[in-house]
Amino acid sequence: MSIVIIAVLALSALALTFGAVLGFASIKFKVEGNPIVDQIDGLLPQTQCGQCGYPGCRPYAEAIANGDAINKCPPGGEATITALADLLDVEAVPLDSEHGESKGKQVAYIREDECIGCTKCIQACPVDAILGAAKQMHTVIVSECTGCDLCVEPCPVDCIDMIPAPSGIRDWAWDMPKPPVSSGAIIATDQNNGMAA
């Protein structure tokens, strides 16, 4: 046999052996996640903003599962606190003012005529929602922006504002009809009953 064939067979045998060992190890030493952490993480807004004091939503979910307060997430607001309270069967408490205030869903807006193209906001964005290049105008992809507010601080010319997120069909806020405000309003059946008496 040729030396090349022997080398190929030897390497194939090694690859097969290492593959089997790695496959066995992945099954034997598999780490199961905590299902309550997954449920808590699913309720958090996934802005990865760090306003809660943790580097992202997953670490905060782990902290909540270990007994930390549920009211440290300003982007989630009261709705998230209520959902977490229902899940964990604890009392819903108001948002902790130390971590900010709930402002509803917001997105970053770059005043493009003032942008100097420094790329500091791009580097700060945890979800790559800002487009631009060095010495070029930057802009925000609204559908990707989580409203974490991390791009505002590093901007040297203060050309980034946080504005309310535009509403679409999925999150449209419809006004409920208001009842008529008249004292002593009578409906037709009441009026007819009163006449018959």
From Swiss-Prot:
Domain 4Fe-4S: 32-90
Family according to the record: Belongs to the 4Fe4S bacterial-type ferredoxin family. RnfB subfamily.
Record note on quaternary structure: The complex is composed of six subunits: RnfA, RnfB, RnfC, RnfD, RnfE and RnfG.
Record region (Hydrophobic): 1-26
Keywords attached to this entry: 4Fe-4S, Cell inner membrane, Cell membrane, Electron transport, Iron, Iron-sulfur, Membrane, Metal-binding, Repeat, Translocase, Transport
InterPro entries linked: 4Fe-4S_dom (IPR007202), 4Fe4S_Fe-S-bd (IPR017896), 4Fe4S_Fe_S_CS (IPR017900), Elect_transpt_cplx_RnfB/RsxB (IPR010207), RnfB/RsxB_Proteobac (IPR016463), RnfB_subfamily (IPR050294)
Positions bound to [4Fe-4S] cluster 3: 125, 145, 148, 151
The 4Fe-4S ferredoxin-type domain, residue ranges: 106-135, 136-165
E.C. number: 7.-.-.-
Keyword Zinc applies: no
Cofactor: [4Fe-4S] cluster
Subcellular location: Cell inner membrane
Organism in which the protein naturally occurs: Hahella chejuensis (strain KCTC 2396)
GO terms under cellular component: plasma membrane
Highest taxon above the source species: Bacteria
Swiss-Prot/TrEMBL GO biological process terms: electron transport chain
PANTHER family linked: ION-TRANSLOCATING OXIDOREDUCTASE COMPLEX SUBUNIT B (PTHR42859:SF3), OXIDOREDUCTASE (PTHR42859)
Annotated cofactor note: Binds 3 [4Fe-4S] clusters.
Protein task: Part of a membrane-bound complex that couples electron transfer with translocation of ions across the membrane.
Full protein name: Ion-translocating oxidoreductase complex subunit B
Binding site for [4Fe-4S] cluster 2: 115, 118, 121, 155
Binding residues annotated for [4Fe-4S] cluster 1, in chain numbering: 49, 52, 57, 73
